Amino acid sequence: MDTETEAEKQERHNNYLNELAEQDRWLPINNVARLMKNTLPATTKVSKDAKECMQECVSEFISFVTSEACDRCTSGKRKTINGEDILLSLHALGFENYAEVLKIYLAKYRQQQAIKNQMMYPKEDVEGSYTEEESRAEDADHVTQERQQPLHPVPSSASTTTSTEVSASEHVQSSSKSTHNPAQAQPRIVVQQPLGSRHSTADHL
């Protein structure tokens, strides 16, 4: 039989939420332990309480510096914390030695990111090179011109030769017609004799 009251359930739920919030404040202890072992010799071992202590210290340090950077962004009416804000916060809080090292690391990190972006998204910066939009527009114009042109275009010289040949053939045909038609070449002349001479010729016959 469940004898837990509603108030006890709510209290247990609140404790669970507090534990989650507390865990979210700290860095993962495995990551902290790995960083510690990378600095120490291979034969050195780290106890559990040392890992937990370092976990809490590192998490508090991050929260401390981030809070100072957030105040700077708020005073500057900005919503995004950048790398320069962290470096200025370290100087303001007395961590100048860390700030100088992190400044070098930030410059190298941004340089590597720029190279990575250029490899992933290459751009043609050469003068006279075509962009993708220009090449697409040129291809579209070329296709439009091909559609407007006839399938078998006739060169201008060929058309001039054809018209000359047609006119010459017409001239030859007209000349041949005039040669083979004797009526047009030599007109027929009829000579009529006088009426008296016709009768005399008939009587003679």
Curated annotation (Swiss-Prot):
Biased composition annotated in UniProt, kind: Low complexity: 154-170
Xref: InterPro entries: CBFA_NFYB_domain (IPR003958), Histone-fold (IPR009072), Transc_fact_NFYB/HAP3 (IPR027113), Transcrpt_fac_NFYB/HAP3_CS (IPR003956)
Broad class of the protein's primary localization: nucleus
GO cellular component terms given for this protein: CCAAT-binding factor complex
Polar residues: bias regions: 171-184
PROSITE patterns xref list: NFYB_HAP3
UniProt-annotated stretches for the region Disordered: 126-205
Region listing for Important for subunit interactions, in residue ranges: 54-65
Domain of life: Eukaryota
Presence of the UniProt keyword Transcription regulation in the record: yes
Subcellular localization(s) per the UniProt record: Nucleus
DNA-binding region positions on the chain: 27-33
GO molecular function, one term: protein heterodimerization activity
Pfam families referenced in this protein's UniProt entry, alphabetically: CBFD_NFYB_HMF
Keyword Transcription: yes
Xref: CDD domains: HFD_NFYB
Keywords from the UniProt entry: Activator, DNA-binding, Nucleus, Transcription, Transcription regulation
Function of the protein: Binds to the upstream activation site (UAS) of the CYC1 gene and other genes involved in mitochondrial electron transport and activates their expression. Recognizes the sequence CCAAT.
PANTHER family noted in UniProt: CCAAT-BINDING TRANSCRIPTION FACTOR-RELATED, NUCLEAR TRANSCRIPTION FACTOR Y SUBUNIT BETA
Assembly mode: Two complexes bind CCAAT; complex I, that consists of HAP2/3/5 and complex II, that consists of HAP2/3/5/4.
Family label: Belongs to the NFYB/HAP3 subunit family.
Protein name: Transcriptional activator HAP3
Native source species: Kluyveromyces lactis (strain ATCC 8585 / CBS 2359 / DSM 70799 / NBRC 1267 / NRRL Y-1140 / WM37) (Yeast)
Phylogenetic lineage: Eukaryota, Fungi, Dikarya, Ascomycota, Saccharomycotina
Gene from which the chain derives: HAP3
